[in-house]
Amino acid sequence: MNIELIVQLTSLALITLAGPLIVALLFLKQGNL
């Protein structure tokens, strides 16, 4: 298996998982304000 392919897949997975988390954090920050 290519290491570059694994890195790309892991980065995409992290982005897809971190996306909603970042949105939730921004939502909470706006709610606190």
UniProtKB/Swiss-Prot annotation:
Membrane topology, from the record: Single-pass membrane protein
Family: Belongs to the Psb30/Ycf12 family.
Biological role: A core subunit of photosystem II (PSII), probably helps stabilize the reaction center.
Keywords, in A-Z order: Chloroplast, Membrane, Photosynthesis, Photosystem II, Plastid, Thylakoid, Transmembrane, Transmembrane helix
Membrane-spanning parts: 5-25
Assembly, per entry: PSII is composed of 1 copy each of membrane proteins PsbA, PsbB, PsbC, PsbD, PsbE, PsbF, PsbH, PsbI, PsbJ, PsbK, PsbL, PsbM, PsbT, PsbY, PsbZ, Psb30/Ycf12, peripheral proteins of the oxygen-evolving complex and a large number of cofactors. It forms dimeric complexes.
Name of the protein this chain belongs to: Photosystem II reaction center protein Psb30
GO CC terms: chloroplast thylakoid membrane; photosystem II
Keyword Transmembrane helix in annotation: yes
Primary location group: plastid
BP-aspect Gene Ontology terms: photosynthesis
Compartments, record wording: Plastid, Chloroplast thylakoid membrane
